Amino acid sequence: PRGRLADVWLHPHLWRLDLGVFVLHTVQMAMWVVVPALLVQAGLPKAQHWHVYLPAVLASFLMLGGLFAAERRGALRGVLRTGIALLFAVQLALLLLAPRAPGLWTLGALLLFFFIAFNLLEATQPSLISRLAPAHARGAALGVYNTLQSLGLFAGGALGGWLVKAGGPQAVLVATSVLALLWLLLGWGQVMPASKASAAPSAARAF
């Protein structure tokens, strides 16, 4: 319903998450216009790129245990900020290092940090959407979130393809760095839902 969508679009705590998922997937797709060429430049044929991607992805999944531990300690805001900051740091490092033809170990480390950031943010944001959205508009909130995720995938591919033709890899990495920095600045004030630990005493006082 139109009213529920308005509640979602105008909600003071949801727009940062919606912006975030759009930026995350825009950066992901645009970045991947550049990364394969950097790996080839570093001496790794395209058919062997999985030798870098697979270990980086698997190692990043091992880091998710820290996310769940941090959530139990009520440190979810720190996890979210760390993920966004790490995403920005990776884009900035690629921007600075790409003209110098970074080696495979450097690229592998940057991809590991990227996947750590990506997995942290992918695991954190949908949970925050469902917990911060008004109960009557939770479905609409998740629908808007998923729509912006899809739009980010499209925008990243289109933007990356256009920029690499117009200005080369550096233009793509400037754009991804600016987007990640914008998200970091705007997302720094993201409100967190009350933790279960803090909610319990409040409920007890109510009785």
Question: Model regions: which residues?
Answer:
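C-terminal transmembrane helical hairpin of 12-TM major facilitator-type secondary transporters
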Residues: 78-125
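Loop-to-transmembrane helix entry/capping segments in MFS-fold secondary transporters
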Residues: 46, 135-145
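Short amphipathic helix-loop junctions that connect adjacent transmembrane helices
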Residues: 33-49
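Multi-pass alpha-helical transporter architecture, strongest
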Residues: 176-207
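A membrane-interface helix-boundary motif in multi-pass transporters
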Residues: 162-180
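Helix-to-loop junctions at the C-terminal end of transmembrane segments
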Residues: 62-77, 164
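Juxtamembrane intracellular "pre-TM" segments in multi-pass secondary transporters
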Residues: 1-20, 204-207
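Pair of pore-lining "gating" transmembrane helices in MFS-fold secondary transporters
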Residues: 11-31, 112
